[in-house]
């Protein structure tokens, strides 16, 4: 085998590989002989079909298969010999056979050489927060509202009330599609409706008929309503006030607390809040570290890796649509290219961090991650056992652990400052509720 390597553009490499023609001819001949022994052709006894007949019938297909195998096998030998690391599957272009050699071209991309830079220039503001008694009380109030019962009242509608109504919406005096409803139920203050709609109902009583003026947001999903002024003619049929449950042992029982009553519920709530806080703090620091790493390191990305990541993201997006995908056109790659490129770049850079620091997933950390995740389930031990018995899930958790270790390694050289933050403020920002 003879090999020549050509750097075409960027990360693309072109291998020209020559293989002795006699090698292919021998493989073809051997394959034809094997086929002759098992072929069943009318007019010939089993195992007695002449090679010329087999060649006429199957020769072209056999030769094509052999050439494919030869190209694949010799390509692998060539990249090992040339110390090349392909970032994707090669494209093979078979050339001619001159009687002495068979030549083919393999084109592919290689992984870029990554040299980490600017690690000491990464700036991280590390938030410090804790769950206080007041935070637990706030969560209990949220849970009370979620378990509220409602009863009709003869008074003006107030924030937090549920109302029932009939309404008809119009733009420029014309009703629009989707702007009409009967027996519509709405909790005031929920933010379900466009700005101004809920506020326009406050202060009105059941039985009243009135009109409110609102404006559809510029980013509204219906193109014909974006930014439009609208009127809604409303008939308020019922106002219901919330009755919140008392905070006692009976309230705790609503959440499956059979022993310990209210204090046990508070302890469980605090544990869950601490778990969520720890995850959010980690995610916040990780995002800052990753953003700093990306900003300080510009690398050429293999198109093959980006294309592969685009396909993964597209498949995930299609799965989120569920059963609605039957008649949907394929989502364009452009929707995912930027996110895919970011993910590929992060993977390459963190891979180099792991390699440079000779990191290996710590078993104790892996088990800690599994235990933390399992604690959110009714039977944590069952979840832990399931993960430990599943190779794929365990590999995923090892990857998560390695990523954590890589971020921690980067933090050692980063410029880190600490900042005290309140639990509620931090969690609202982390979950996009700020």
Swiss-Prot record:
Its EC number is 5.2.1.8. Transmembrane segments: none annotated. GO terms for biological process: 'de novo' cotranslational protein folding; cell division; chaperone-mediated protein folding; protein transport; protein unfolding. It is found in: Cytoplasm. Keywords: Cell cycle, Cell division, Chaperone, Cytoplasm, Isomerase, Rotamase. Residues 160-245 form the PPIase FKBP-type domain. Gene3D superfamilies: 3.10.50.40, Trigger factor ribosome-binding domain (3.30.70.1050), Trigger factor, C-terminal domain (1.10.3120.10). It is an enzyme of class 5 (isomerase). One of its GO terms (molecular function) is protein folding chaperone. It catalyses: [protein]-peptidylproline (omega=180) = [protein]-peptidylproline (omega=0). One of its GO terms (cellular component) is cytoplasm. The keyword Glycoprotein does not apply. Its main location: cytoplasm. It comes from the Bacteria. The keyword Cell division applies. Belongs to the FKBP-type PPIase family. Tig subfamily. Involved in protein export. Acts as a chaperone by maintaining the newly synthesized protein in an open conformation. Functions as a peptidyl-prolyl cis-trans isomerase. HAMAP family: Trigger_factor_Tig (MF_00303). Consists of 3 domains; the N-terminus binds the ribosome, the middle domain has PPIase activity, while the C-terminus has intrinsic chaperone activity on its own. This is Trigger factor. It comes from Shewanella baltica (strain OS155 / ATCC BAA-1091).
């Amino acid at each position: 085998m003879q090999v020549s390597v050509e750097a075409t553009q960027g990360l693309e490499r072109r291998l020209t590989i020559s293989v002795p023609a006699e090698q292919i001819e021998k493989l073809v001949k051997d394959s034809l002989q094997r086929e002759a022994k098992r072929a069943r052709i009318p007019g010939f006894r089993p195992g007695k079909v002449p090679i010329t007949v087999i060649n006429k019938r199957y020769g072209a297909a056999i030769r094509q298969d052999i050439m494919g195998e030869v190209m694949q096998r010799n390509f692998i030998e060539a990249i090992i010999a040339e110390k090349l690391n392909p970032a994707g599957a090669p494209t093979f272009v078979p050339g001619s056979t001159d009687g002495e050699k068979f030549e083919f071209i393999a084109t592919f991309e290689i992984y870029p050489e990554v040299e980490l830079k600017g690690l000491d220039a990464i700036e991280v503001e590390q938030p410090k927060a804790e769950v206080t008694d007041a935070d637990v009380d706030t969560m209990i109030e949220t849970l009370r509202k979620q378990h509220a019962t409602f009863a009709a009242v003869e008074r003006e509608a107030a924030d937090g009330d549920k109302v029932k109504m009939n309404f008809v919406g119009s733009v420029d005096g014309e009703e629009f599609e989707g702007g009409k409803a009967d027996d519509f139920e709405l909790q005031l203050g929920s933010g379900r409706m466009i700005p101004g709609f809920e506020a326009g109902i406050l202060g009105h009583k059941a039985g009243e008929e009135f009109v409110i003026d609102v404006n559809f947001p510029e980013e509204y999903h219906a193109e014909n309503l974006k930014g439009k002024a609208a009127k809604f003619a409303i008939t308020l049929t019922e106002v219901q006030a919330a009755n919140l449950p008392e905070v006692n042992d009976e309230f705790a029982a609503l959440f499956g607390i059979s022993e310990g009553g209210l204090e046990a519920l508070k302890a469980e709530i605090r544990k869950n809040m601490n778990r969520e806080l720890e995850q959010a703090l980690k995610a916040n620091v990780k995002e800052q570290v990753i953003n700093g790493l990306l900003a300080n390191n510009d690398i050429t990305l293999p198109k093959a890796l980006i294309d592969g990541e685009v396909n993964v993201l597209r498949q995930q997006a299609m799965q989120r649509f569920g059963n609605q995908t039957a008649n949907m056109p394929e989502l364009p790659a452009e929707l995912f290219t930027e996110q895919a490129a970011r993910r590929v770049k992060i993977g390459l850079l963190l891979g180099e961090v792991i390699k440079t620091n000779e990191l290996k997933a710590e078993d104790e950390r892996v088990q800690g991650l599994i235990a933390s995740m399992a604690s959110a389930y009714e039977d944590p031990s069952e979840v832990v056992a399931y993960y430990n018995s599943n190779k794929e899930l365990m590999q995923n958790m090892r990857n998560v652990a390695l990523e954590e270790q890589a971020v921690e390694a980067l933090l050692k050289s980063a410029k880190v400052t600490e900042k005290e933050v309140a639990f509620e403020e931090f969690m609202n920002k982390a979950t996009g509720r700020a």
